[in-house]
C-alpha cells in the first residue's frame, strides 16, 4: 500500500463517474462548495480482509436523481423513484469501491465487500461535515458532492 487513500478515492470516483454517467467531478475547497439546500443521501460501503475500511458518498437528491437516471438509461431525473435512486447509489459506491481497492492495494488481495447502505441526512449535517479534514469535496454539474475514506 502506497499513497494517500483520498487521492486514490478521488481517482476512482472520477473514473467511475466519467465512464458510468459521463459526468466529471471537479475537486473544490470546502469554502468554495455550493450550499447543501435540503436532504441529502449518504451511501456507505465497507470492505474487510487483509485491509479494512469504509467509503462514503453524500449528495443531494437532485444530483442522485440525475446520476440514477443516467445509470438506468432514462431521459431525466424526474422519471426516477426513490427506490431506483437508492439502488443506483448502491451500484455507484460498489463500483467506486472496487476501483478504489484495486488502485490502493493492487490486484492480488481478496476483500469481503458489504452490501451498501443508503441513509438520509439533512443539509445542516452536510455543512458541518465540510470542516472535517477527512472529507473530499467535489462539485458535479453544479451540485455539491462529499466523499469519505476511512481506513481501519
Residue ranges and their predicted role:
Residues 1-152:
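N-terminal auxiliary interaction/assembly segments of multi-subunit proteins
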Amino acid at each position: 500500500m502506497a499513497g494517500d487513500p483520498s487521492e486514490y478515492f478521488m481517482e476512482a470516483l472520477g473514473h467511475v463517474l466519467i465512464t458510468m454517467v459521463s459526468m466529471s467531478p471537479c475537486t473544490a475547497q470546502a469554502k468554495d462548495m455550493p450550499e447543501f439546500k435540503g436532504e441529502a443521501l449518504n451511501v456507505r460501503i465497507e470492505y474487510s480482509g487483509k485491509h479494512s475500511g469504509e467509503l462514503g458518498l453524500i449528495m443531494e437528491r437532485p444530483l442522485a436523481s440525475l446520476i440514477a437516471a443516467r445509470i438506468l438509461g432514462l431521459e431525466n431525473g424526474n422519471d426516477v423513484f426513490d427506490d431506483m435512486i437508492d439502488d443506483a447509489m448502491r451500484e455507484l459506491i460498489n463500483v467506486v469501491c472496487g476501483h478504489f481497492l484495486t488502485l490502493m492495494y493492487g490486484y492480488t488481495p481478496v476483500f469481503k465487500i458489504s452490501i451498501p447502505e443508503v441513509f438520509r441526512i439533512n443539509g445542516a449535517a452536510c455543512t458541518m461535515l465540510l470542516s472535517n479534514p477527512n472529507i473530499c469535496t467535489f462539485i458535479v454539474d453544479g451540485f455539491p458532492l462529499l466523499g469519505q475514506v476511512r481506513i481501519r
